[in-house]
Amino acid sequence: MDGARRSRLLGVWSLAVYLFLYAPLAVLAAFSFNRERLTAQWRGFTLDWYARLLGNTQVLTALRNSLLVAAVATVLATAIGTAAALAFHRHRFRRQGVLDALLTLPIVIPEIVMAASLLLLFAGIGLRLGFLTVVLAHVAFSVSYVVLVVRARLAGFDRSLEEAAMDLGAGPWRTFLQVTLPGIAPGVMAAALLVFALSIDDYVVTSFVAGVGSTTLPLQIYSMVRSGVSPEINAASTVLLVATALLLFAAWRVEQGGRARSAAAPAVLGLAILAAPFVLVGPPAPEDRVLNVFIWSGYLPPETVRDFEARHGVRVNVDLYDSLEALLAKLQAGNASYDVVCPSNYAVEILLHQNLLQPLDRSALPHLSNVDPAWLDRDFDPGNRHTVPYFTGTCGIGYRRSRVGEVDSWRALWDPRWKGRILMLDDARETLGAALRLLGRSVNTSDEPTVRRAMRLLVQQKPLVRAYDSANFEDALLAGDVWLAQGWNGEFARVMDLDPDLAYVVPKEGSTTYLDSLAIPAGAPHPKLAHAFLDFVMEAEVSAAICRSMRYTTPNRAALAFLPPAIRKNPAIFPPREVVGRLELLRDIGPATTLYDRLWTEVKTAR
């Protein structure tokens, strides 16, 4: 093979690699300008999603938090890392190799390990989760990068310049400020920009250590994905992507030194664009007039928040979680400061067992009488002493009628005719639960042989499954990527409004139901305001407005009078009585949770 041909082949391979890396990002950015909510169809150019993004207070607050955290963490990490780099480069001391390895360890250890260890540390010393813990965590994982970058710059630094300055009478500090620091400035600047980029992008560590009012933009975006990947999320991701790219480009150019430093201007411009919406976020309210809510994304309409703020003259901080495990971890750590949380029924059992919820004052909840008695006095919270019902729902099958006809059984998800067109939830309890109901067993069984039979059913089904996805199953069905999808009724109800060919069914073998409740954590800083919020969302008109917006089933009987017939008579939102009779609440199964998780892992890794 001649040189020209090898060169062309190398160019083709390089192009393929870059397309693989960057084509998805280009698609994301392009569809942030799509007029259609469905990302699989292009309906024309629009800037509406960016306008909506600028009007989203939660996103703007998260953006502000990201910028503040990144700025403070950058200053601290750069100062500490530069000092450490100088010390390790210029001095020799005992066990330096061990200390050097420990200093760079955060680069190689898994992020999840660092996140969990930091959460335990903060809980152990009684430090409340919030802005400070996020900053400290970001400094902890980024100092190592500063040390590596600055030491690389120090390797080429001529120390004779320092000696000459000191021979001329300059003291140590003057020598450092006027000789050393200017000489290593490109490395320091590059390290600072790298830290800023790492901080503003971080999700894993931040998700563990963030507390009240410290939700960052990555946390906000990831939580919003639970309601589907809308162009608004694409717009926010594009803004973050562009800013990060500018910062990394500037870091590389600054490290080159000389005239290349002028290339830092795009980074400054990117930061200015990001910071512009900051002024749109109002100043924080006094501490005693703040309500801190920790809830699922897509569960609390912004209009409801604004109405409560206007009525009570308070500010509501809404932080979002993407799994019940995240909620449990924050409350179990004991150093969060939330006033209202939204656990599912089996999470309530765990929280009550650990005394993490405070009793409710029923006299402050007159609108509890609006709730359907069928959803009150459940065995996970007898007498509703600690919780009030908020949303309920079912797990079933969403399907495309024109492709698969009418569906009434879980067996449709095992039908080889639909190979590659089936989607299952990435959820151990729900997915094993579907197999258990197909076997005629309870979704709450802890009998290992029975659960193993369900696991084997899922392994047999796996060649038919296109994906396991709990975040975007309804979008995959709407786009036509799959024709059958296991999922929850609220998400399917929203996309059924967009495509009449879509339908939802609770299989005849039965399925799971859940009851998400509102509760006040033990030690909540504003319990009176929390009671006012719980009572507010139980008002008939407020509950109806939430149901209209979110499309989940409201257990508020009085709200039905304020719902349009299209919602009130939609069986996907309000299942008929015969369907309710074959639903089973998910319960806390205690030690058997480990069994479910282990067997679900076997399903996911099966070939």
Give names to the regions the model predicted.
Residues 283-351:
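Early extracytoplasmic/lumenal segment of secretory-pathway proteins
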